Amino acid sequence: MIKLTVDLMIEINRGMLEKWIEKHPDKFEGVGSDRDKLADILTEVEKQDNVIGKAAYLLARIAWDQPFSGGNKRTAVICADIVLRNEGFKLYIENKEDEEYLRKLLFEVQEERVEINPTTIAKLVLYVSKRITRI
């Protein structure tokens, strides 16, 4: 089991951004993080009732809070998958259509500036519940 911590989330983001920068040096997004936001996100994730809710909430909160200077949505997907794997599941994004729909949902969340819309969270819960498989 891999414990998802603030430090691990930062490490995931940095590693992911380094690979991105290698492939797209002209699109450098910067590397930085807000440890307080990340700690708050993890605290709130733990309050969720089940692993699907935790994964969906993690996806939403990272996309909404933008705790990293770049790669927030990509980092959110990796972190949500870790939470699922710790419970014996994995996120299975089968095709480009699935990927694009998740991206659309995360952009919806990102645009919600006052608070996360419960309807969008419900869509994320449904998305995750239909795209997990036992490992």
Where are these predicted regions, by residue range?
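FIC/Doc superfamily catalytic core
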Residues: 1-135
